[in-house]
Amino acid sequence: MDRYLGLARRDARRLFKLPKTERVRLVATHGRSISGICEYTRDYQSTVKLNVDLRWTWPALRDMAAHEAYPGHHVHQATREWEYLHGDFPREAAVSLAACPMGPVEEGIGENAMWFLRWDRTPEDRMTLALNRLRWGTEVNLAFMVHRDEPRRELLRYAMHSGLVDWKQAVRDVRYARNRTWASYAFCYWYGTAIIRNQFLKMDGDPALFDVLYWRPHTVRTLAAAFRRL
């Protein structure tokens, strides 16, 4: 994971002029329900926590490095702090909240981070990106199934069949869907990814896209309006 963080940082710096002092610290965690998380503090510093109780493939670690750090959540938060301190960001734009109108933008950036780096060229990376889409589509459907009070055994069966995961991962996915806060957040991943990826492919990686995504605060509606002006 350290190696992929370094490679992602190198490639992200070709896209963004980042503060020289920005850093990411990698910490191993155990027994957490999450697979990984970026905890941004201040002064362009983040801690990326990785659940080492899970089984990881090297393409999944590449995706995690890009999603949580470069050019995903860490870079997004660092640019927002810079704009707050030196630009014209309002104070509330520097705050990150789960399951709010900014959520699809934040997770859409994270889920497309490998695309931004052009880390979508090998069969392994393309498979990882496809599995990510499958996972969040499955989570959205699981959230609807929970809302309909479908039995847990049906949730687990669907999670395994649709998400192509084993029993242990299906249990984690169902637990996620039964948490009301996180169930709503699944939609941020699914729809945020689609909105941003469609624009990225349309613009073929034009830097103007990154100016909109990273250097301006957006909700889904303001982002859609900004995309129409590009």
Identify the residue ranges that each predicted region occupies.
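Catalytic glutamate of the conserved HExxH
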Residues: 64, 68-77, 108
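Soluble non-cytosolic domains of exported or imported proteins
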Residues: 2-3, 55, 65, 100-104, ...
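Contiguous, non-catalytic segments that form substrate-binding/exosite surfaces or channel walls
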Residues: 1-45
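C-terminal, non-catalytic "cap/extension" segments appended to globular domains
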Residues: 167-230
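Long, amphipathic alpha-helical stalk/connector segments used for oligomerization, subunit docking
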Residues: 107, 111-180
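Second-shell loop/turn segments in exported
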Residues: 1, 60, 94-101, 128-129, ...
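Post-HExxH zinc-binding segment in Zn-dependent metallohydrolases
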Residues: 77-125
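Short pre-active-site segment immediately N-terminal to the catalytic Zn-binding motif
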Residues: 49-66
